[in-house]
């Protein structure tokens, strides 16, 4: 029997062994996990993986072969570009642009442009892109996704295609997940672009319209996904061209593309206005939900994340509320009660959200970060507020919205970078039409990923995790423990407190978030133990031996902030009383033992002098904390500056980093010899990709490292999605502290996770299919709106005549049945409708229409009325412009924009209701998506007709006053002045 067949037989035989009563387990000593690395069935899995690789080939090798010729061509230009002076290198940008103007394409320039950027990066940053980074840049330029492992230099890679595509003058957007990364990349990588003669822009929260306009007008713009999306929506609410900040889209590079296009795909960007909702109903519903019993009054579907009232629940709710119908649209009690039960059963404190004061703050399930300012929609957030007894905020109404799926597909070319994309190839291809290419690593990966250790119960799992941490801590290896929630991270912390093992806790709690950089800076040090909620999106590499750069920054921050930041009210009170000890003197101090060594006397004096210089230049205690943090960040980067304080702080930062590096480099050698960073996973995520992100924290740039996941059959993933096989194992095993070993089990766990991935992919795909309907409507509405916003007088007149003609068609079709004889047409009623529409039609009566209709039929009647409508419009233009020149143009533009905005807002509410309603039609054997498309199209057609009718009617009814008096138009326009707020 072959090894493969033998291994398979052992897997198949497992169930029979269990049935016979002898559970196949591995007894362990000391750690409770030692035997787990020899999980039965692993040889089969390894051989299957090997066969698959032989059949399909190594994707990284395929990528290398595909691009190697162009990489060699770039390398061949190295000597030539190195010989150029700075001025000659910069002149290459002018040369490239001239060649583009003469008909060359950016593809024609790729090899030369990449060689120029590589040389510029070497001169400006001291970093020379490796061959694999050139490959990554080529992949991005082709509009694909480059999968590059953690620590492979994705940030530098983006400079290559950004420069090349910016040569056209149409702009490039480099998108990051937060403001800090956008600013860091603009200041750091932006130096390359500026050195080569390109402009580099930055968009940050809180910027003015003019600052945003300048940023988006630059050749390369660094911006977060949310700022970019909200600016798009605000531009499509602008009341004048002077409010527009973005130009036409060209090329976009997304960093952490999986986070934005997949994890954020279900979260639309929404600009909303306030709408009153009675908070008493949320409170009443919360009380009823609290009194109701699960599985009697209602059922919970954790997989679908939904709840369903039982008959008993319906009757009890109607009795308690004294209503006859929970679904009465006038009261909508069903919605309040369903949300209250969801808040009780599905939204867990310290898992899905945290409570800070009187505020409910959502925790991002993927990154473990708090999502300040984000709120659940459709009343769910208010239901959670009622559950927790905090202030209930008003409901909102959507004014404009867009999903990231729809928004980023509007770019002519889109590329992305991430460390984990291969598992989502299908989604990137089917939804975004993006291919994924795996970039080879610069150095071979030497991390060891151990087989999962699986226990029957959570008790056994946590005991094993505890022992594993203790074992690694005694060895001296740094340990990173990944958890899926705040609650779980604190549970592990309690266990380590009992064992006397020091640790750092990094989760969404405010006190821990504030120390994030401090915690990450030392996570790679000897014997460090770090417990963190999902590390996805943390954006910082863990450096073995400690991060000297981060620690140097923290040392400068500790000394600078207490001298430069404005005191808070409480501190001022203490200072006035002369109690400086309580005036926040230690507010910025880090925990004892963070720094690897004391500063030398010379560097300590240098630090003191730099802080004094900053106080002298900026003013003692003169800056807000955020402004001070931004200045410190800039001082610790390499951006050009002539600010004396920035230069002094930068010099001492560099000096401290040099001293710290002596110690961190020595400690790194020790940690490397011990085996590097050990990562412990405590639960499989809904996506293998997020698990891989945690694993990827270890083994950076060829460093040694190891990972191991500790699981239990009671984990949510397997409890909800595991199926009959895992339930059978739960019944078969009774020993809690022994790991279960079985190839069948491992395969079942893998299948459960794949099932979850498929399930959530199907949800996102369904959302995408539905959103495609709304997105096509959005694009048409925004096109018409922008057409009016930017139109000349002649263009507006053409648009108005088009509206007038279509409106007359609507009136004729609504009042005349063309299939009947013209002699029987109710022309008197038609005349009455026309007079309501425009008072100029008062000059027309039935006797004018009857001969036209009887002689030429319906088409002649339409042509006659259209001609009269054009005459009426021209007379109205003359009447209005006689009061003030170009007043008619302003009025027309205002009416089109205001009617479009108001009716689009109503349309968003209506189509949202349709989407909720069509789901039930599946029970009638109808396709909900087709039903949604049909009803959505009807709603859209009626909305566009309503916009036209309202605009034309408003124009004809507009009666301008003389210039010395305020006109209704000006007053109405003033109300729109602040419409660009989120």
Where do the protein language model's features map onto the residues?
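Intrinsically disordered, low-complexity segments used for protein-protein interactions
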Residues: 12-16, 27, 46, 613, ...
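N-terminal chloroplast transit peptides
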Residues: 1-32
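Conserved P-loop NTPase motor core
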Residues: 44-734, 783, 801
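N-terminal mitochondrial targeting presequences
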Residues: 3-5, 34, 38-49
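Intrinsically disordered, low-complexity segments enriched in Ser/Pro/Gly/Ala and basic residues
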Residues: 7-10, 22, 36, 364, ...
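Generic anion/oxyanion-binding catalytic loop in active/binding sites
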Residues: 27, 78, 454, 770, ...
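Extended, charged helical/alpha-beta scaffold domains that provide interaction surfaces
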Residues: 353-361, 367-374, 636-639, 672, ...
């Amino acid at each position: 029997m072959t090894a493969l067949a033998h291994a398979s037989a052992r897997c198949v035989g497992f169930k029979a062994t269990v049935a016979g009563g002898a559970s196949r387990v591995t007894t362990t000593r000391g750690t409770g996990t030692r035997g787990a690395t020899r999980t039965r069935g692993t040889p089969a899995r390894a051989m299957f993986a090997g066969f698959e690789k032989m059949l399909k080939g190594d994707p990284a090798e395929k990528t290398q072969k595909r691009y190697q010729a162009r990489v060699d061509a770039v390398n061949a230009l190295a000597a030539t570009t190195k010989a150029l002076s700075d001025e000659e290198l910069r002149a290459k940008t002018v040369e490239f642009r001239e060649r583009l103007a003469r008909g060359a394409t950016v593809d024609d320039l790729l090899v030369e442009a990449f060689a120029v950027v590589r040389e510029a990066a070497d001169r400006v940053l001291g970093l020379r892109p490796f061959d694999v980074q050139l490959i990554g840049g080529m992949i991005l330029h082709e509009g694909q996704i480059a999968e590059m492992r953690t620590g492979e230099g994705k940030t530098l890679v983006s400079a290559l295609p950004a420069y090349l595509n910016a040569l056209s003058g149409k702009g490039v957007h480099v998108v990051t997940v937060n403001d800090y990364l956008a600013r860091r990349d603009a200041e750091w990588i932006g130096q390359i672009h500026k050195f080569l003669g390109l402009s580099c822009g930055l968009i940050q929260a809180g910027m003015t319209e003019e600052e945003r306009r300048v940023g988006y007008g630059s050749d390369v713009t660094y911006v977060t996904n949310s700022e970019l999306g909200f600016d798009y929506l605000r531009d499509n609410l602008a009341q004048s061209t002077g409010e527009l900040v973005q130009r036409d889209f060209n090329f976009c590079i997304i960093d952490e593309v999986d986070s934005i296009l997949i994890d954020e795909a279900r979260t639309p960007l929404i600009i909303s206005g306030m709408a009153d909702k009675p908070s008493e109903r949320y409170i009443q519903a919360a009380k009823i939900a609290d009194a109701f019993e699960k599985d009697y009054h209602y059922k919970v579907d954790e997989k679908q994340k939904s709840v369903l009232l039982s008959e008993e629940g319906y009757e009890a709710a109607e009795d308690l509320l004294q209503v006859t119908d929970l679904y009465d649209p006038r009261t909508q009690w069903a919605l309040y009660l369903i949300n209250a039960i969801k808040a009780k059963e599905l939204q867990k404190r310290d898992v899905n959200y945290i409570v800070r004061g009187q505020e409910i703050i959502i925790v991002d399930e993927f990154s473990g970060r708090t999502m300040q300012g984000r709120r659940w929609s459709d009343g769910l957030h208010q239901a959670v507020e009622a559950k927790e007894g905090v202030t209930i905020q008003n409901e909102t109404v959507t004014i404009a919205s867009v999903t990231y799926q729809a928004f980023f597909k509007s770019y002519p070319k889109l590329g992305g970078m991430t460390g984990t994309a291969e598992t989502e190839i299908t989604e990137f291809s089917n939804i975004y039409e993006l291919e994924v290419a795996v970039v080879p690593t610069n150095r071979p990966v030497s991390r060891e990923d151990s087989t999962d250790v699986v226990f029957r119960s959570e008790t056994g799992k946590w005991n094993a995790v505890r022992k594993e941490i203790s074992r690694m801590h005694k060895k001296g290896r740094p340990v990173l423990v990944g958890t899926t929630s705040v609650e779980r991270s604190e549970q592990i912390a309690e266990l380590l407190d009992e064992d006397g093992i020091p640790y750092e806790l990094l989760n969404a709690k405010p006190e821990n978030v504030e120390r994030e950089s401090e915690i990450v800076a030392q996570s790679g040090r000897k014997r460090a133990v770090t417990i963190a909620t999902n590390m996805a999106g943390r954006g910082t590499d863990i450096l073995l031996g400690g991060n000297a750069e981060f620690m140097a920054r923290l040392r400068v921050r500790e000394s600078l902030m207490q001298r430069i930041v404005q005191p808070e009210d409480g501190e001022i009170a203490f200072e006035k009383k002369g109690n400086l000890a309580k005036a926040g003197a230690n507010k910025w101090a880090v925990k004892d033992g963070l720094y690897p060594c004391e500063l030398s006397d010379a560097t300590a004096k240098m630090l003191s002098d730099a802080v004094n210089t900053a106080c002298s230049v900026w003013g003692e205690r003169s800056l807000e904390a955020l402004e001070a943090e931004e200045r410190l960040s800039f001082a610790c980067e390499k951006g050009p500056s002539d600010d004396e304080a920035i230069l002094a702080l930068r010099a001492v930062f560099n000096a401290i980093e040099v001293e710290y590096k002596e110690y961190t480099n020595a400690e790194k050698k020790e940690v490397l010899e011990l085996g590097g960073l050990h990562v412990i996973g405590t639960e499989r995520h809904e996506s293998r990709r997020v698990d891989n992100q945690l694993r990827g924290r270890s083994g950076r740039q060829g460093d040694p490292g190891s990972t191991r996941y500790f699981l239990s059959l009671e984990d949510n993933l397997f409890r909800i999605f595991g199926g009959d096989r895992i339930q059978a194992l739960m019944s078969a095993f009774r020993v809690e502290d022994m790991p279960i070993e079985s190839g069948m089990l491992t395969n079942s766990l893998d299948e459960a996770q794949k099932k979850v991935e498929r399930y959530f992919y199907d949800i996102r795909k369904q959302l995408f299919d539905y959103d495609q309907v709304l997105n096509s409507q959005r694009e048409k509405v925004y096109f018409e709106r922008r057409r009016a916003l930017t139109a000349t007088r002649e263009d507006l007149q053409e648009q108005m005549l088009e509206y007038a003609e279509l409106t007359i068609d609507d009136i004729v079709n609504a009042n005349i049945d063309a299939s009947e004889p013209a002699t029987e047409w109710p022309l008197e009623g038609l005349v009455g409708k026309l007079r309501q529409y425009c008072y100029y039609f008062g000059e027309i009566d039935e006797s004018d229409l009857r001969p036209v209709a009887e002689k030429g039929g319906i088409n002649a009647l339409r042509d006659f009325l259209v001609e009269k409508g054009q005459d009426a419009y021209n007379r109205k233009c003359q009447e209005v412009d006689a009061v003030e020149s170009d007043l008619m143009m302003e009025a027309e533009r205002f009416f089109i924009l205001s009617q479009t905005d108001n009716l689009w807002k109503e349309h968003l509410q209506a189509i949202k209701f349709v989407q909720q309603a069509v789901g039930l039609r599946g029970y009638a054997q109808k396709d909900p998506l087709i039903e949604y498309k049909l009803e959505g199209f009807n709603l859209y057609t009626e909305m566009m007709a309503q916009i036209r009718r309202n605009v034309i009617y408003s124009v004809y009814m507009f009666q301008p006053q003389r210039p010395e008096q305020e006109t209704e138009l000006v007053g109405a326009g003033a109300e729109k002045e602040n419409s660009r707020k989120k």
